[in-house]
């Protein structure tokens, strides 16, 4: 149920635990479109990931399960990922490039975010939270390791596409001081002195998308 891995070599891959290397290979092969050809390896990696409760392994196998059209396992893994994230912030041992610290956090969180985006009703708030955590790890040279940077960018781009599609499907009404805001822009005519009230109403509660409210003003009173 696993792959025959070379034990020699001087790079970081040689020191990666076999269970993680096998999980990554299954993940990569399902990404490439393979399915029944690696069923035994997939089943073995799935069992090990669920037993490990490791965030990195679980997130990869969630994505693999989706590609394998294994809905039952996908949901089971996502439940475990959600529990792990809420309890411990998604603890992981290491990654396929033997990452630690910030790089490992970015890789694990990016994979978890990508897995969340595969759900029929993605948890947008959770994904936003994960991406915010990832962006905080960004340095001048990227998000840590090359693998971490690639996964971080993939998560950000995928989320942009997801939100864009949801925004097209969402029916949102903005009301400022009981006046509908039709063009999503307001002027002084819509505002009054003192307290102003902005109401955002989603006509489809299952199609909620994030929004930004930008206020610009000048005043003679400091």
Model-inferred region functions:
Residues 1:
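Extracellular LysM carbohydrate-binding repeats and other cell-envelope/extracellular binding modules
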Residues 5-15, 20-222:
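Long, domain-scale non-catalytic interaction/scaffolding regions in large secretory-pathway
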